[in-house]
Protein backbone atom coordinates (compact mmCIF):
# COMPACT_ATOMS: atom_id res chain seq x y z
CA UNK A 1 0.00 0.00 0.00
CA UNK A 2 2.82 2.38 0.85
CA UNK A 3 4.48 1.86 -2.52
CA UNK A 4 1.19 2.44 -4.37
CA UNK A 5 0.68 5.65 -2.45
CA UNK A 6 4.15 6.80 -3.43
CA UNK A 7 3.47 6.13 -7.11
CA UNK A 8 0.17 8.00 -7.02
CA UNK A 9 1.82 11.01 -5.46
CA UNK A 10 4.65 10.91 -8.00
CA UNK A 11 2.34 10.73 -11.02
CA UNK A 12 0.47 13.78 -9.72
CA UNK A 13 3.51 15.91 -8.89
CA UNK A 14 6.41 14.86 -11.12
CA UNK A 15 5.88 17.81 -13.48
CA UNK A 16 6.05 20.25 -10.59
CA UNK A 17 9.15 18.59 -9.19
CA UNK A 18 11.01 18.79 -12.50
CA UNK A 19 10.05 22.43 -12.93
CA UNK A 20 11.32 23.63 -9.55
CA UNK A 21 14.40 21.41 -9.32
CA UNK A 22 17.20 22.62 -11.64
CA UNK A 23 19.55 20.15 -13.30
CA UNK A 24 22.40 21.08 -10.97
CA UNK A 25 20.12 20.94 -7.91
CA UNK A 26 19.46 18.27 -5.33
CA UNK A 27 20.41 14.74 -6.37
CA UNK A 28 20.35 11.55 -4.34
CA UNK A 29 23.21 9.14 -3.90
CA UNK A 30 22.03 5.90 -5.43
CA UNK A 31 23.89 3.04 -7.11
CA UNK A 32 21.63 3.21 -10.13
CA UNK A 33 23.64 4.03 -13.25
CA UNK A 34 21.84 5.57 -16.21
CA UNK A 35 23.40 6.44 -19.56
CA UNK A 36 21.87 7.04 -22.97
CA UNK A 37 22.52 7.46 -26.66
CA UNK A 38 20.66 9.39 -29.33
CA UNK A 39 18.75 6.76 -31.29
CA UNK A 40 18.93 8.76 -34.53
CA UNK A 41 22.66 9.47 -34.03
CA UNK A 42 24.11 6.47 -32.19
CA UNK A 43 27.69 7.48 -33.02
CA UNK A 44 27.48 10.67 -30.91
CA UNK A 45 29.51 10.81 -27.71
CA UNK A 46 29.56 13.22 -24.79
CA UNK A 47 32.50 15.04 -26.42
CA UNK A 48 30.58 15.68 -29.66
CA UNK A 49 28.20 18.50 -30.51
CA UNK A 50 24.92 17.23 -31.91
CA UNK A 51 23.21 19.09 -34.74
CA UNK A 52 19.41 19.06 -34.58
CA UNK A 53 16.67 20.76 -36.58
CA UNK A 54 13.53 22.30 -35.18
CA UNK A 55 10.46 20.24 -35.95
CA UNK A 56 12.15 16.86 -35.70
CA UNK A 57 11.90 14.47 -32.76
CA UNK A 58 14.96 12.98 -31.12
CA UNK A 59 14.82 9.79 -29.09
CA UNK A 60 16.96 9.22 -26.01
CA UNK A 61 17.57 5.52 -25.58
CA UNK A 62 18.43 4.96 -21.92
CA UNK A 63 20.31 2.04 -20.41
CA UNK A 64 19.79 1.70 -16.65
CA UNK A 65 21.84 -0.59 -14.40
CA UNK A 66 20.69 -1.30 -10.84
CA UNK A 67 23.66 -1.81 -8.53
CA UNK A 68 21.59 -1.42 -5.37
CA UNK A 69 20.76 -4.27 -3.02
CA UNK A 70 17.05 -3.49 -3.45
CA UNK A 71 14.89 -3.07 -6.52
CA UNK A 72 14.60 0.38 -8.07
CA UNK A 73 11.51 1.55 -9.96
CA UNK A 74 11.78 3.98 -12.88
CA UNK A 75 8.77 6.29 -12.73
CA UNK A 76 9.40 9.36 -14.90
CA UNK A 77 11.60 11.38 -17.23
CA UNK A 78 12.08 15.06 -17.87
CA UNK A 79 14.94 17.35 -18.80
CA UNK A 80 16.15 20.86 -19.51
CA UNK A 81 17.94 22.80 -22.23
CA UNK A 82 20.67 24.86 -20.57
CA UNK A 83 22.86 27.74 -21.75
CA UNK A 84 26.29 26.02 -21.91
CA UNK A 85 28.36 29.04 -20.87
CA UNK A 86 26.21 30.30 -17.98
CA UNK A 87 24.27 27.24 -16.84
CA UNK A 88 20.98 29.15 -17.01
CA UNK A 89 17.93 27.04 -17.80
CA UNK A 90 16.44 28.09 -21.15
CA UNK A 91 13.77 25.44 -21.69
CA UNK A 92 12.11 23.00 -19.29
CA UNK A 93 10.82 19.90 -21.04
CA UNK A 94 7.43 18.53 -20.10
CA UNK A 95 7.75 15.74 -17.56
CA UNK A 96 6.36 12.35 -18.54
CA UNK A 97 5.65 9.27 -16.48
CA UNK A 98 7.18 5.94 -17.44
CA UNK A 99 6.07 2.46 -16.53
CA UNK A 100 6.52 2.03 -13.65
CA UNK A 101 9.51 -0.12 -14.62
CA UNK A 102 10.86 -2.26 -11.79
CA UNK A 103 14.57 -3.09 -12.08
CA UNK A 104 15.71 -5.89 -9.79
CA UNK A 105 19.12 -5.77 -8.05
CA UNK A 106 21.97 -6.52 -10.47
CA UNK A 107 19.74 -6.21 -13.54
CA UNK A 108 19.49 -3.59 -16.28
CA UNK A 109 16.71 -2.16 -18.42
CA UNK A 110 16.42 -0.15 -21.64
CA UNK A 111 13.74 2.50 -22.12
CA UNK A 112 13.20 5.53 -24.35
CA UNK A 113 12.19 9.18 -24.19
CA UNK A 114 10.96 11.12 -27.24
CA UNK A 115 11.80 14.83 -27.34
CA UNK A 116 10.05 16.97 -29.98
CA UNK A 117 12.28 19.94 -30.81
CA UNK A 118 10.58 23.32 -30.72
CA UNK A 119 13.09 25.79 -29.30
CA UNK A 120 14.83 28.95 -30.46
CA UNK A 121 17.80 28.24 -32.74
CA UNK A 122 20.84 28.36 -30.45
CA UNK A 123 23.54 26.34 -28.72
CA UNK A 124 22.36 24.20 -25.80
CA UNK A 125 23.35 21.63 -23.24
CA UNK A 126 20.63 19.01 -23.03
CA UNK A 127 20.41 17.57 -19.51
CA UNK A 128 17.97 14.63 -19.24
CA UNK A 129 16.41 13.78 -15.89
CA UNK A 130 15.25 10.36 -14.72
CA UNK A 131 13.14 9.88 -11.61
CA UNK A 132 13.08 6.63 -9.65
CA UNK A 133 11.40 5.30 -6.54
CA UNK A 134 13.79 3.71 -4.03
CA UNK A 135 13.37 3.02 -0.32
CA UNK A 136 9.92 4.66 -0.46
CA UNK A 137 11.44 7.93 -1.72
CA UNK A 138 11.43 9.67 -5.10
CA UNK A 139 15.00 10.22 -6.24
CA UNK A 140 16.54 12.14 -9.12
CA UNK A 141 19.31 10.23 -10.91
CA UNK A 142 22.29 12.22 -12.19
CA UNK A 143 22.82 11.85 -15.97
CA UNK A 144 25.40 13.35 -18.32
CA UNK A 145 24.51 16.26 -20.60
CA UNK A 146 24.79 16.50 -24.38
CA UNK A 147 25.96 19.61 -26.22
CA UNK A 148 23.79 20.43 -29.23
CA UNK A 149 23.12 23.11 -31.82
CA UNK A 150 19.51 23.59 -32.91
CA UNK A 151 18.79 25.24 -36.26
CA UNK A 152 15.71 26.06 -38.32
CA UNK A 153 14.83 23.70 -41.19
CA UNK A 154 15.62 24.69 -44.77
CA UNK A 155 12.53 25.91 -46.60
CA UNK A 156 11.82 24.04 -49.83
CA UNK A 157 10.10 25.75 -52.76
CA UNK A 158 7.71 22.78 -52.72
CA UNK A 159 6.71 23.43 -49.12
CA UNK A 160 2.85 23.53 -49.04
CA UNK A 161 2.78 26.76 -47.05
CA UNK A 162 5.26 28.41 -49.40
CA UNK A 163 3.34 27.20 -52.46
CA UNK A 164 0.14 28.68 -51.02
CA UNK A 165 1.89 32.00 -50.42
CA UNK A 166 3.25 31.97 -53.98
CA UNK A 167 -0.25 31.36 -55.37
CA UNK A 168 -1.68 34.21 -53.28
CA UNK A 169 1.02 36.59 -54.50
CA UNK A 170 0.54 35.48 -58.11
CA UNK A 171 -3.23 36.01 -57.90
CA UNK A 172 -2.68 39.43 -56.30
CA UNK A 173 -0.32 40.58 -59.05
CA UNK A 174 -2.62 39.19 -61.75
CA UNK A 175 -5.60 41.06 -60.29
CA UNK A 176 -3.60 44.27 -60.01
CA UNK A 177 -2.41 43.92 -63.61
CA UNK A 178 -5.96 43.37 -64.86
CA UNK A 179 -7.20 46.40 -62.91
CA UNK A 180 -4.47 48.63 -64.40
CA UNK A 181 -5.22 47.39 -67.92
CA UNK A 182 -8.99 47.86 -67.62
CA UNK A 183 -8.91 51.38 -66.16
CA UNK A 184 -5.81 52.81 -67.81
CA UNK A 185 -4.01 50.51 -70.22
CA UNK A 186 -6.97 49.81 -72.52
CA UNK A 187 -7.63 53.53 -73.11
CA UNK A 188 -3.95 54.20 -73.62
CA UNK A 189 -3.57 51.52 -76.27
CA UNK A 190 -6.74 52.68 -78.04
CA UNK A 191 -5.44 56.26 -78.24
CA UNK A 192 -2.08 55.29 -79.70
CA UNK A 193 -3.20 52.56 -82.07
CA UNK A 194 -1.45 52.86 -85.49
CA UNK A 195 -3.61 54.22 -88.36
CA UNK A 196 -3.61 52.07 -91.46
CA UNK A 197 -2.26 53.89 -94.54
CA UNK A 198 -4.70 54.39 -97.40
CA UNK A 199 -3.87 52.38 -100.48
CA UNK A 200 -4.21 54.23 -103.76
CA UNK A 201 -5.90 52.38 -106.56
CA UNK A 202 -3.99 52.01 -109.76
CA UNK A 203 -5.51 53.91 -112.69
CA UNK A 204 -7.42 51.79 -115.18
CA UNK A 205 -5.76 51.35 -118.53
CA UNK A 206 -6.66 54.18 -120.91
CA UNK A 207 -8.58 53.74 -124.03
CA UNK A 208 -5.42 54.71 -125.82
CA UNK A 209 -3.72 51.57 -124.60
CA UNK A 210 -6.77 49.47 -125.47
CA UNK A 211 -6.86 50.81 -129.02
CA UNK A 212 -3.16 50.42 -129.50
CA UNK A 213 -2.47 54.19 -129.51
CA UNK A 214 0.17 55.85 -127.43
CA UNK A 215 -2.13 58.55 -126.04
CA UNK A 216 -5.69 59.13 -124.92
CA UNK A 217 -7.88 60.75 -127.61
CA UNK A 218 -10.87 61.36 -125.39
CA UNK A 219 -9.87 64.91 -124.64
CA UNK A 220 -9.15 65.93 -128.28
CA UNK A 221 -11.93 67.92 -130.02
CA UNK A 222 -13.89 65.87 -132.53
CA UNK A 223 -13.29 68.42 -135.35
CA UNK A 224 -9.56 68.09 -134.88
CA UNK A 225 -9.75 64.32 -135.06
CA UNK A 226 -11.81 64.47 -138.26
CA UNK A 227 -9.27 66.85 -139.73
CA UNK A 228 -6.47 64.39 -138.98
CA UNK A 229 -8.39 61.55 -140.58
CA UNK A 230 -9.02 63.63 -143.75
CA UNK A 231 -5.31 64.37 -144.05
CA UNK A 232 -4.44 60.69 -143.75
CA UNK A 233 -6.97 59.77 -146.44
CA UNK A 234 -5.49 62.32 -148.83
From Swiss-Prot:
Residues 1-19 form the signal peptide. It is found in: Endoplasmic reticulum membrane. GO terms for cellular component: endoplasmic reticulum membrane. Residues 20-162 are lumenal. InterPro entries: TRAP_alpha. The chain crosses the membrane at residues 163-183. Keywords: Endoplasmic reticulum, Membrane, Signal, Transmembrane, Transmembrane helix. It is a single-pass type I membrane protein. It comes from the Eukaryota. It holds the Pfam family TRAP_alpha. Is probably involved in a pathway contributing to genomic integrity. This is Increased recombination centers protein 22. The gene is IRC22.
Amino acid sequence: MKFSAILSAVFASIAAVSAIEPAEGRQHEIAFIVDYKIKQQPELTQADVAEWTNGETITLQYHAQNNEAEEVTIIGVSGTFIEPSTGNVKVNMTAATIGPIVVAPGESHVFEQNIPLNVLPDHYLLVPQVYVAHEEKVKHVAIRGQLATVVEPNVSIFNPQLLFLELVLLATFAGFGYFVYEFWGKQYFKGTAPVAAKVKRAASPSSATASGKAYDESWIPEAHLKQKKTKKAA
